[in-house]
Curated annotation (Swiss-Prot):
GO terms for biological process: apoptotic process; cellular response to lipopolysaccharide; cellular response to staurosporine; defense response to bacterium; execution phase of apoptosis; fibroblast apoptotic process; heart development; lymphocyte apoptotic process. Changing D198A: Strongly reduced cleavage and activation by initiator caspases. Abolished cleavage and activation by initiator caspases. In P7-D2A mutant; abolished cleavage and activation, leading to decreased but mesureable activity. This is Caspase-7. It comes from the Eukaryota. Cleavage by different proteases, such as granzyme B (GZMB), caspase-1 (CASP1), caspase-8 (CASP8), caspase-9 (CASP9) or caspase-10 (CASP10) generate the two active subunits. Its involvement in different programmed cell death processes is probably specified by the protease that activates CASP7. Cleaved and activated by initiator caspases (CASP8, CASP9 and/or CASP10), leading to execution phase of apoptosis. Cleavage and maturation by GZMB regulates granzyme-mediated programmed cell death. Cleaved and activated by CASP1 in response to bacterial infection.
Length: 303
């Protein structure tokens, strides 16, 4: 059971600002590994501008009164019965995400330490709001997790139960609009050792075409890690995934398409972060985010 910390925490043991940890249920009680994320020197080079024609037919319409709502659920503290430790560093993630998504134009609201029922209620109510004048919707979940589930402060809830409120048959005012979910949580307990590297056309035959939209269409899920693996977090700096996501969005959030943005996030997490620990089991581990897209068009946050 994990999320984004670089160490498995012992109950009652506090993280130092330099430790990375994985949000997992403690199962190695004999140690708390000392970890830090090692970032390669960040050489910011303005990438050579590649001009690519945008084809409106294949882009989401962003010409709305507002960009949309962004809900951030930031779970840091957990009931003792869950066996989960405090997610030190998650407040840095929440703060960075709030600033980043607000600068993109989202109306951002942060909720802290939510129970499973509270998370369900928040998202159900959000799905029942009128999004007619909004271009899209975003939700960011910061918590402990396992594959397919995420922790509220009092236990686990299926991620699908949270996102299903926004299906096309349940949230009509977001039909054919992008629904974005960013999930910073572990998806298992496997560790990535890494490996050394050498360095269609629209059918417009009908004047007023009628068509059905799959209820699961227009969703995007950006996970901090692949299925089965830990996700790392630094109590001093925040999670690797969120650090990279905010950095790329600040640089290119208004000029790159969402999949280009998330591909760069993948690259940054994969190349710029690595754990170090006195315990060989947690030494020099890597992480790669995972994107699952059911988007049907290209998404640019600027018109």
């Amino acid at each position: 059971m994990a999320d984004d910390q670089g160490c498995i925490e012992e109950q009652g043991v506090e993280d130092s600002a330099n430790e990375d940890s994985v949000d997992a249920k403690p199962d190695r009680s004999s140690f708390v590994p000392s970890l830090f994320s090692k970032k390669k020197k960040n050489v910011t080079m303005r990438s050579i501008k590649t001009t690519r024609d945008r084809v409106p037919t294949y882009q989401y319409n962003m010409n709305f009164e507002k960009l949309g709502k962004c809900i951030i659920i930031n779970n840091k503290n957990f009931d003792k019965v869950t066996g989960m430790g405090v997610r030190n560093g998650t407040d840095k993630d929440a703060e960075a995400l709030f600033k980043c998504f607000r600068s993109l134009g989202f109306d951002v609201i942060v909720y802290n330490d939510c129970s499973c029922a509270k998370m369900q209620d928040l998202l159900k109510k959000a799905s029942e709001e009128d999004h007619t004048n909004a271009a899209c919707f975003a939700c960011i979940l910061l918590s402990h997790g396992e594959e397919n589930v995420i922790y509220g402060k009092d236990g686990v809830t299926p991620i699908k139960d949270l996102t299903a409120h926004f299906r096309g048959d349940r949230c009509k005012t977001l039909l054919e609009k992008p629904k974005l979910f960013f999930i910073q949580a572990c998806r298992g307990t496997e560790l990535d050792d890494g490996i050394q590297a050498d360095s269609g056309p629209i059918n417009d035959t009908d004047a007023n075409p009628r068509y059905k939209i799959p209820v699961e269409a227009d969703f995007l899920f950006a996970y901090s890690t692949v299925p089965g693996y830990y996700s790392w977090r630094s109590p001093g700096r925040g999670s690797w995934f969120v650090q990279a996501l905010c950095s790329i969005l600040e640089e290119h959030g208004k000029d790159l398409e969402i999949m280009q943005i998330l591909t760069r996030v993948n690259d940054r997490v994969a190349r710029h972060f690595e754990s170090q620990s006195d315990d060989p089991h947690f030494h020099e581990k890597k992480q790669i985010p995972c994107v699952v897209s059911m988007l049907t068009k290209e998404l640019y946050f600027s018109q």
